[in-house]
From Swiss-Prot:
The keyword Zinc does not apply. Belongs to the LDH/MDH superfamily. MDH type 2 family. It comes from Delftia acidovorans. One of its GO terms (biological process) is tricarboxylic acid cycle. NAD(+) binds at residues 11-17. It catalyses: (S)-malate + NAD(+) = oxaloacetate + NADH + H(+). Keywords: NAD, Oxidoreductase, Tricarboxylic acid cycle. This is Malate dehydrogenase. Its EC number is 1.1.1.37. Catalyzes the reversible oxidation of malate to oxaloacetate. One of its GO terms (molecular function) is L-malate dehydrogenase (NAD+) activity.
Amino acid sequence: XKKPVXVAVTGAAGQIGYA
């Protein structure tokens, strides 16, 4: 599932990693 914490971490760090 998608957890709020996880989403926040993967959302910020994820976009930086992909970008």
